[in-house]
Each structure stands twice: as structure tokens, then as C-alpha cells.
């Protein structure tokens, strides 16, 4: 996997709530995320300021789970982001101060533009290589309204796969499924 030189040490918003430190292993398979070159993502969901769930997932596990999602759902999600996010303009704007403030990437929903402090729930997601966060389309934040839009696009098959994954990983019923994008 290619990545740019735009990276910084894993910032605190992506540290584990449980340990107060960066994630060290994949929440699915247990692989070492600090191994040089290890690619992974971190997703955290919040209800206001409270962490609802969090996980770190190696790229192999992500690819395996993504392969279980319906092609129709994946296409609808891609179309949704193409229609609602100007990724190039977002990256230009955010790269201006990426190294000074990771929070600038995470304080507003990348789709709706809402300030996350004004939402009931939100999720943040980042891409990482060993001890570093990569700035590309990641990191990003999604408000509850954007998540609701995305969930409506998912097929029953995809919702089932994501709910199975959520139940396996967290052993709880979530109001919205884990969105592995």
C-alpha cells in the first residue's frame, strides 16, 4: 500500500480510551500494529464526549471484512462520498495546518460540515502505519446525520455482515453499525 510523507505520531484522539495509550494490536486478529510498515485503521464512536466503541484493525482484517460487503452497497457509498465531499479541496484546506492541529481534521463532519460538538453522536476514523497517522483522505469525522445517510444505503446483506462484526468485536448491540470505510 502506498502512503504519502504526510504523517505524524499517532495523536491522542486516536489513543485507546481503555489504556490511555496508542493501540498496540489489531482488535480482530491480535497482530502487532507497531511492527514496521503495519497498516491499520482506528475507528472511534462517541455519544457527545463519551466513547461508545473503539477498535484498531489491521489492513488484512479490513480487507477481509470489506470483501463480505455487497458490491452494490460499496458502490452506493462511493457515490455518496463523491457527491458530498470535495476530497481535493478538503485535503488542500486541511493540509495547510495538518501538522499543527489534528483536531482541524476532526472537529467537523467531512460530509455535512457540522461542528461535532453540536451532534448527538459522531465517529472518527484514521489510517496508520506503525506508530504514525497518515494524512490522505484520512483522518475524518462523520456526524450522526451522515452516518444515518450511509446506513440507509446499505443492503440487508451488508448490514448483516457489519452487525455480525460489531457483535463479534464488542458483544453489544450498537445503534449504528461499525462503518468500515
Residue positions per predicted region:
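Domain-exit/linker segments immediately C-terminal to small folded modules
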Residues: 91-111, 115-117, 127-129, 150-152, ...
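Short recognition patches in nucleic-acid-associated and regulatory proteins
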Residues: 20-52, 72, 103-137
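Short Cys/His-rich Zn2+-coordinating modules
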Residues: 2-15, 37-45, 86-98, 124-126
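Short C-terminal domain-edge/linker segments immediately following a structured domain
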Residues: 59, 87-91, 139-142, 171-176
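Short intrinsically disordered terminal tails
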Residues: 180-181
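Short amphipathic alpha-helical linker/capping segments at the junctions of internal repeats
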Residues: 45-50, 74-87, 130-132, 158-172
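Surface-exposed beta-loop interaction hotspot
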Residues: 69-107
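Short metal-binding segments enriched for Cys and/or His
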Residues: 52-78, 134-162
Amino acid at each position: 500500500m502506498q502512503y504519502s510523507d504526510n504523517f505524524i505520531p499517532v495523536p491522542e484522539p486516536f489513543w485507546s480510551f481503555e489504556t490511555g495509550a496508542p493501540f498496540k494490536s489489531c482488535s480482530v486478529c491480535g497482530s502487532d500494529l507497531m511492527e514496521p510498515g503495519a497498516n491499520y485503521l482506528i475507528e472511534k464512536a462517541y455519544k457527545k464526549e463519551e466513547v461508545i466503541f473503539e477498535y484498531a484493525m489491521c489492513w488484512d482484517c479490513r480487507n477481509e471484512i470489506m470483501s463480505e460487503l455487497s458490491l452494490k452497497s460499496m458502490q452506493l457509498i462511493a457515490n455518496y462520498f463523491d457527491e458530498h465531499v470535495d476530497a481535493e479541496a478538503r485535503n488542500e484546506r486541511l493540509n495547510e495546518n495538518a501538522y499543527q492541529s489534528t483536531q482541524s481534521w476532526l472537529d467537523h463532519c467531512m460530509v455535512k460540515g457540522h461542528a461535532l460538538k453540536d451532534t448527538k453522536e459522531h465517529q472518527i476514523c484514521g489510517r496508520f502505519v506503525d506508530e504514525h497517522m497518515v494524512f490522505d483522505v484520512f483522518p475524518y469525522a462523520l456526524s450522526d446525520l451522515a452516518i444515518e445517510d450511509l446506513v440507509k444505503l446499505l443492503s440487508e446483506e451488508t448490514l448483516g455482515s457489519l452487525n455480525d462484526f460489531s457483535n463479534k468485536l464488542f458483544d453489544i448491540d450498537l445503534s449504528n453499525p461499525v462503518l468500515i470505510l
